[in-house]
From Swiss-Prot:
UniProt record similarity statement: Belongs to the DtxR/MntR family.
NCBIfam families hit by this protein: PRK03902.1 (NF003025)
Gene3D superfamilies in the cross-refs: Iron dependent repressor, metal binding and dimerisation domain, Winged helix-like DNA-binding domain superfamily/Winged helix DNA-binding domain
Cellular compartments per GO CC: cytoplasm
Annotated ranges, domain HTH dtxR-type: 1-63
InterPro entries noted in UniProt: DtxR_MntR_Metal-Reg, Fe_dep_repressor, Fe_dep_repressor_sf, HTH_DTXR, HTH_tscrpt_reg_MntR, Iron_dep_repressor, WH-like_DNA-bd_sf, WH_DNA-bd_sf
Keyword Lipid biosynthesis listed: no
Binding locations of Mn(2+) 2: 11, 77, 99, 102
Gene Ontology terms, MF aspect: DNA binding; DNA-binding transcription factor activity; manganese ion binding; protein dimerization activity
Activation and inhibition: DNA binding is strongly activated by Mn(2+).
Descriptive protein name: HTH-type transcriptional regulator MntR
Manganese recorded as keyword: yes
Amino acid sequence: MPTPSMEDYIEKIYSLIETKGYARVSDIADELFVHPSSVTKMVQKLDKDEYLIYEKYRGLILTPKGTQMGKRLLERHALLESFLSIIGVDPSHIYHDVEGIEHHLSWNSIDRIGDVVQFFENHPDALKTLKEMDPTKPDTKE
């Protein structure tokens, strides 16, 4: 299993390839706010663990294993963003909160959160009831 740091790199590489068609060491460094030398070290480790194929000065490509993991990690991130949005977390906190929790949840927990998100997507009345429970709204009952 990849470490949380490895997951961050795989997710970012997958995302870059999906949006730009490629991922360069400099792009990854810019996106993750790290030095290119740190990216090179991690890319070499990911190559050794068969998540990608890296050739110095030529770039990198994800292996099927890396592509599958990258897709799953990106979906996990989006799912957690949806969940936090549904439960009323302030949008300005969502990205940071997801970054803080995504590596600490089991895949079983992620699947259950997916069930909750799907439930609220399929039951707008239940979502409306949940939104009405928002503690930040002033109590209008007297």
